[in-house]
Amino acid sequence: MNKSMIQSGGYVLLAGLILAMSSTLFAADNNLHFSGNLLSKSCALVVDGQYLAEVRFPTVSRQDLNVAGQSARVPVVFKLKDCKGPAGYNVKVTLTGVEDSEQPGFLALDTSSTAQGVGIGMEKTDGMQVAINNTNGATFALTNGNNDINFRAWLQAKSGRDVTIGEFTASLTATFEYI
């Protein structure tokens, strides 16, 4: 037998052993773990009309916004019914929409709005702001039965900008994650 043939055969054998050992090292038992929580039933969202909630701001004067910088708070209530779950379960609500480019965390007015110079803020009733597009959202404790998820919204004047009077609309998506 040729010496170079024996050497190359030895290299192939050595490479095969290394490959076999490396695949054995990565094939350890129980190296992937799954966990979760199954609820018997989450809550049903109450939809009135075509929206989950419709918020009408009262008429706000430009002068009030220019002086105070923001409007009074208006309630935003999401209604959940038939909630069933273990003691201490919660719902995390995240709010997504077009974020105001000048006021991070605030909802931008729709481009069809004639009013300008403001964004819409959202907060929990304890005053903690819930920023638009923040994946942390806001967490609420649930009880079995019916629950109201309470937020408040307000108009926030943009710093250094004039407020233009007119009508406005804006929309966002509320996502509910039961945890």
From Swiss-Prot:
Disulfide bonds join C43-C83. Disruption phenotype: Deletion of the operon under classical laboratory conditions does not result in any major effect on E.coli capacity to form biofilms compared with the wild-type strain. One of its GO terms (biological process) is cell adhesion involved in single-species biofilm formation. Residues 1-27 form the signal peptide. Induction: Expression is negatively regulated by H-NS and subjected to cAMP receptor protein (CRP)-mediated catabolite repression. The keyword Nucleus does not apply. Pfam families: Fimbrial. InterPro entries: Adhesion_dom_fimbrial, Adhesion_dom_fimbrial_sf, Adhesion_dom_sf, Bact_Fimbrial_Adh_Pro. GO terms for cellular component: pilus. It is found in: Fimbrium. Belongs to the fimbrial protein family. Part of the yfcOPQRSUV fimbrial operon. Could contribute to adhesion to various surfaces in specific environmental niches. Increases adhesion to eukaryotic T24 bladder epithelial cells in the absence of fim genes. The operon is cryptic under classical laboratory conditions, but is functional when constitutively expressed. This is Uncharacterized fimbrial-like protein YfcP. The gene is yfcP.
